[in-house]
Structure formats: structure tokens, C-alpha cells
Amino acid sequence: MKKLFPIIILFTSCASVTINPSILSPSNVEIPKKLHRLNIGLAQSRITTLEAVSSIIKQDEMFTIWERELEANIFDSGDEPMGYIDYKVIFNEVVPTEKGKRYFLITNLTFWIPSMVGYPIIEVEKIIEVEITIFNKKMKKINKYNIISKSEPGKLGLYNLYAVEANDMIATVAVTKDIIQIFKSRLESDVESINKQLEASFLSN
């Protein structure tokens, strides 16, 4: 039996998790009155350059979803941007839940023996906080939205640790989509005023 555990660990750790690219697709929920088209991001705020290959520019999943959602469901059909919209990530961490802290304590007090038969090592949740700021053409701030959301708790055990990276991506996508829906609901009551301010700045150039 003792020889069996390393074999199980080896095979489970070699397993892979397949993620369907469709999870990055925008929702099919448009806001009733659209926001005037804006430049997405300020300078390099929405892209990161890979260190290994400096010529490649990578957008991670949260900014991919954000850009697609803006284009599909938030911006109007105007050709020329009337300002800027910035999506700044303030906090993005996986943290243990209170139950997860108890799991971890029990696991360590029992020398990880229960985890060998499927007892969770820890339970965690993904928490993301963002600031979404809208600026006019002259870079004057019009409105700012601070939004926090978190994922459903997820348990980690000895035999699913291989899936941590994939699960983190799935949680990031879910939380980002929730943040965007919260933003859309708040924007609905402000969009008329924001559009008027964008128009005034744009026409005064």
C-alpha cells in the first residue's frame, strides 16, 4: 500500500486540464444606452511584454475579456474615441477561507495522513479589486468605479494540486466577468451624464 501512494501522485500530477477558449468570450448582455467609444487603457496599462521574447506582447485573460466586453456590449458604434477608459487591478490574490485555514491546520497536525485519502489540504477563493476610470479627451477624470468581487471557494487536495494554475485562470475569468457585470449595472445610471461630458470635451478641441 505504501508503494501505491507515490504512483498515484505521479499519475495525477502528470494529468492536464484543458481550458476551452470560449470562456474568454463576452456576454450577450448589452447595456440599454451605450457609452461613447473610448480608447482602452492609458499607455501600457493593459499590456505586458514577455521578458523572454521582447517582440511579443501578451494580454492576460482579464484584459482580453474586458476589451471584448467593451467592444461587444458597452461602446456605441462611433468611429472616433472621445476619451479614455482605464482598468486598473488593485488587488488580485488567492486567499484561504476560514474553513480552508482549519483544513490546513488539521492537515499539518495529522502529518498529512488524511490528505492521502482525499481530505482537503486547504480551501481558497480568488479576490480581485479593480478601479475603472473614465477620462475625457483632455485626460480629465469624469468618473471612477471601485469594484471588488471574489470567486466561489475551491478545495485543494493532494491529488488535484496539478490543476492549481488552470483553476486560478478559471477563477480569474469568473471574477472578472462578475466585475464587468457590476460595472455595467452601475454605468447604466451614469452613462447619459458621462456621454454629455465626453461630447463637450471632444467638441471643444
Write out the residue ranges for each language-model feature.
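A structural "domain/chain start" motif
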Residues: 14-83, 148, 191-205
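C-terminal/domain-edge helix-coil "capping" segments
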Residues: 15-22, 121-131, 138-205
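Surface-exposed short loop/turn segments
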Residues: 81-142
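A mature extracytoplasmic/lumenal domain signature
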Residues: 44, 91-93, 136, 147-151
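Glycine- and small hydrophobic-rich membrane-insertion segments that are intrinsically disordered
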Residues: 48, 53-61, 106-119, 160-166
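Short acidic/His/Gly/Ser-rich catalytic and metal-binding motifs that mark active-site loops
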Residues: 49-50, 98-100, 153-158
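Sec-dependent N-terminal signal peptides
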Residues: 3-12
